[in-house]
Amino acid sequence: MSDPAYDNQAPQEQPQQQAPEGQAVPVYEQPEAETPQAPVASESVAAQPALSEQEALYEAPELETPAQAASDNEWQDEDVSNFRPVPRVAIQAFCESESVANTIDYASRDRRMAKAHLKVQLGGVNAAVEFYQTATTPNLILVESRLIGEELMTELAKLADVCDEGTNVVVIGFKNDVALYRDLISRGVAEYLVAPISMGDIMGVITTLFVDPDSAPLGNTIAFIGSKGGVGSSTIAHNVAWAISSNYESDVVLADLDLAFGTANIDFDRDPAQGVAEAVFSSDRIDETFLDRLLEKCTDHLSLLAAPSTLDREYDFDADDFTQLLDVAQKGTPNVIVDLPHIWTGWVRKTLASADKVVITATPDLASLRNTKNLIDTLAELRPNDGKPYLVLNQCDVPKRPEISIEEFTQPLDMQPSIIIPFDPALFGLASNNGQMISETDSKSEIAATFDTFAQILTDRREIEAPSKKTMGSILSKLSRKKSK
């Protein structure tokens, strides 16, 4: 069963102006042996036989002829002119034919895809399975396959085994079969496209998945709060944001909501002219475009919404003042890290209640235990249908300081800490003074590995494992006696 366009063979009787049929080939193919132009995509790909399928990143050629440029404009006007910009999502495509690879790469060049990170690689489902054995999966995987029936389902089952939660899979095949389509959708495939495909097909499926106003928000909001001042909640939030963005190449917006005393700009060695203050004081103007102007780019995948950290005005807010800001951020970014100050106001309470996940940072002392217990109980009332917050025990094993043991600390909370971070003033002090994260200062340290583990936990890339427990003298009875007074 052969399809000339799908096999990357240009139909002899069809001129290039028929490209609106959705065929990528006429845009990229060159007449054989007519002009000494630079090698096209098929030649550049063939010149890389030493690379394995998952390593062979596809590089499409630039437009070189007026005919190609005209065809490009034709596609853009007909297929994608009405599409909205795609948010900050990671997309990888595994293609068996150059025609499909060309089309997807062409779509990635469109201005509406400027925020997305799209990579095209040669190889089909098998290449994707092999690649993701040792790599995390993006927001969307596009796979091309000539298989049908049980053979296709078997290959997709292997792919499902290596996919992280929340990853969408779109299959590009060659058989126009309603039964096949229904079978794929019933097995969790987001969409099935029949080749030959157009740039409009690719843009359409991406915008349906991530831009559709009726679809679920793209990102998860993770709110960090300390059980008391000075426990290191901001430091934890900043390092986790760094770990998610660098380890998984997943876009992160870090919002420092401690407008008066926030430290995110210092920790990342940035001095943005605007940030969260402009957003919250102009909440009626907040949209994706306005938010983009306020973000300070720290890395390719990490953007900072910094606090002004000045005392030239009072920062009194209503309960709903941050709602619009966080809603807009969540619609356009896979991960929104919210660094909350240690205060208890209407807007902090509402932010915690509406967050997808909450992280409480505490130190092993009585005040932290009491406040952590109060926070957990309050969150249970505010979020009755959500899981418990994540607990981070920080600054443990301070020399000569009596501490509550991990076992005694967690017993009244009825939960285990997700991670335990030891007291290391030299490492944290050096990182802070240099405007770096822990993994930048000492990537081989156990603490850097701990932040990597927590990033995996918060992004649902592994099961939560309880850290080892330590035993020390019990002083929990002191807290009980104080409560009884």
Where are these regions (language model features)?
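Beta-strand-loop-alpha "switch" segments that mediate conformational coupling across diverse proteins
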Residues: P87, C396-D397, T410-I438, F451
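Conserved phosphotransfer microenvironments
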Residues: G124-Y132, T137-A160
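C-terminal output helix
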Residues: I197-V205
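Phosphate-binding/switch loop-helix module in NTP-utilizing enzymes
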Residues: A306-V348
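Inter-motif core of Ras-like GTPase G domains
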Residues: V328, T345-D365
